Design a protein with these regions (language model features):
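Phosphate-binding site of ATP-dependent enzymes
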Residues: 161-244, 249, 254
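Basic phosphate/pyrophosphate-binding loop/patch that engages nucleotide-derived ligands
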Residues: 105-113, 172
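Peripheral (often C-terminal) accessory segments that flank ATP-dependent C-N-forming ligase machineries
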Residues: 131-132, 136, 252-260
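Glycine-rich phosphate-binding loop of ATP-grasp-fold ATP-dependent ligases
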Residues: 20, 114-118, 143-168, 190-192, ...
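ATP-binding N-terminal substructure of ATP-dependent carboxylate-amine bond-forming enzymes
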Residues: 1-104, 108, 120-134
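ATP-grasp fold ATP-binding core
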Residues: 106-107, 136-155, 178-187, 191
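A short glycine-rich, hydrophobically flanked beta-strand micro-motif that places a catalytic Asp/Glu
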Residues: 39-45, 182-184, 254-262
Length: 262
């Protein structure tokens, strides 16, 4: 693929803009170093379709994060334009980005996923559901994780260990999405499982050890805030179980994923 024109799409208008731009610039630099003609397009600064029409690309390298970049939006647009792009097809992106849909698909397929309840922002606003919030803990248990249903980079994610913390955590999640998930907290070793190629060749498991205990936005993007071990420090049987669960997730279009190995 030497010398191919490649448009790196990064930035956008989401809260993950800065992270996306950092990644996009690194990709562009690496591609140019390999002899390609790569340039960066930021949808917040340019009209994407007009820019792609004016300077055609053989490939669009997607480095957008969050809404529009990971939810199938830009993928559907590029499909309409007949342009090739990196990453997952539009429908798979849409399903994986929506945690409510993704967890429901996993549960129906028999893939382990922590118990959860969904708190819709409209139910709080229009139906007086706020008084029912404590009942979520009756289903899930006191220790839980609250997260936006549609967001990335762990923005709006909170760990709740007291009932008094729940309302604030839900409102924080709803600032990033129209619904919040209250999910049972799982204690264990956190690992990321990845695959490459159509044959789903397994990459080494990555063990994730955030120093403050929660793998939130700061832990992901602050240098030194998290330790990573590759391969993960798991025995062979547990590692195999994790890979099998992650591979099953790809079958139902809800990978990539992060798993906790108990």
């Amino acid at each position: 693929m030497s010398g191919r024109p490649i448009a790196v799409i990064a930035g956008g208008r989401t809260p993950e803009r800065d992270v996306s731009l950092r990644g996009g610039h690194r990709v562009m630099t690496a591609l140019n170093g390999l002899g390609h003609d790569a340039w960066l397009l930021d949808p917040a600064d340019v009209k994407l379709v007009e820019s792609l029409d004016a300077r055609p690309a053989d490939l669009c390298w997607l480095a957008l994060h969050g809404k529009e970049g990971e939810d199938g939006t830009v993928q559907r647009l590029l499909d309409l334009l007949g342009l090739r792009y990196t990453g997952t097809p539009a429908f798979d992106c849409e399903l994986a980005f929506d945690k409510v849909l993704a967890k429901d698909v996993l549960r129906r397929a028999g893939v382990p996923t922590p118990d959860w309840v969904v708190i819709e922002g409209s139910a709080l606003r229009d139906l007086g559901a706020g008084v029912a919030l404590p009942r979520a803990l009756e289903w899930i248990g006191l220790r839980c994780i609250v997260k936006p249903s549609r967001s990335g980079s762990a923005l709006g994610v909170s760990a709740v260990e007291r009932e008094t913390e729940l309302a604030g955590a839900v409102m924080g999640a709803l600032s990033f999405s129209g619904a919040a998930i209250v999910e049972r907290m799982i204690r264990g070793t956190e690992v990321a499982a990845g695959f490459v190629g159509a044959a789903l060749e397994a990459l080494p498991l990555v063990e994730i050890v955030p120093k403050d205990g929660v793998y939130d936005y700061s832990a992901r993007y602050t240098a030194g805030a998290t330790e990573y071990f590759v391969p993960a420090r798991l025995d062979a049987g547990v590692a195999s179980t994790v890979r099998d669960a992650a591979r099953a997730g790809t079958k139902y279009s809800v990978a990539p994923a992060v798993y906790r190995a108990l």
